[in-house]
Amino acid sequence: MPKFVIEREMPNVGNLSDREFCAAAQKSIQALREIGPQIQWLHSYVTGNKIYCVYLAPDEATIQNHANKAGIPANRISAVRRMIDPTTAE
């Protein structure tokens, strides 16, 4: 299944409490359950004002549908074309 990186612009998101992150994750998981097994949240990276999420999904429309249901932005959705790591240099 295609992999996507979603950029979510969320001012001061890096300052949220553990409780707030828990509530946001629960809302996201509920939206995932409503959509079905064709979308999977792998993990997210939180910075000061953005969250970068990595998902598996059939297409961008499914990612946007999830964002709408969860009430969270999806400012940029980028399909992953290739992954590289230090072993790529070998």
Where are the regions that the model predicts?
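Short S/T/G/P-rich N-terminal loop/turn motif that feeds into the first structured element of a domain
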Residues: 1-33, 40, 50, 82-90
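Short, flexible active-site loop motifs that bind/organize anionic cofactors or intermediates
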Residues: 11, 53, 67
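A short linear hydrophobic-aromatic micro-motif
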Residues: 37-43, 76
